[in-house]
Amino acid sequence: QRRLGDIETAMATMTFAGRFSEGGGSNVSQRLNLAVWQTGILQPRQALETANGIGDNLSPYGEAVQQWVRFAAYRQLGDLARAEQAKAWLQAHDDVAAGYFMEALLEDNALDAAAAHLIGRLQSTQHRSDTLLSVQRFVTVPSLPGDAERDRRWWQVVARRDVQAALNAVGRSDAYAIVARGSSR
């Protein structure tokens, strides 16, 4: 539905999907995805309500998504102290946060730090494959309003000379006429 440009219907579907049980319990993954989308459409209060309603018994990755939602939502609400707490958690757990610390750096417009972080991930044998995939250009859906500036900054960081030098040392970045799995990047 999002690929068809119908954000409202997509949100309604995600809300409905979040009501189903998952493995006998709360449908955590769908509810976290909904909370991320709520930050993307600039609904920070709803995003916090959704994310906090899940509870704290999450996988490490689930907790990372929850902390990302808190960071983004508190930033949108102007509560920078709470946003910084969530960002500190993302930084401390970057190995399991699957790029959410990078997203926080981009949201903060900390482009030098984002470039250094990206270079570090390119140089890491543990993170290189996922990082190389992240710098490829695919056919994507348009960015949600809350994601657009961060997405623009991402490509600005990828285009930097220092990042390109690190990238070219271990791989390459190219554009492909293949539809991406779901992200706006």
Region roles according to the model:
Residues 1-13, 17:
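Solenoidal tandem-repeat scaffolds enriched in leucines and small polar residues
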Residues 15-25, 52-61, 85-96, 119-130, ...:
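Solenoid-like repeat scaffolds
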Residues 32-33, 67-69, 76, 99-100, ...:
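"A position-specific structural signal for the A-helix of alpha-solenoid helical repeats
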Residues 98-185:
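Long, ordered, amphipathic alpha-helical scaffolds
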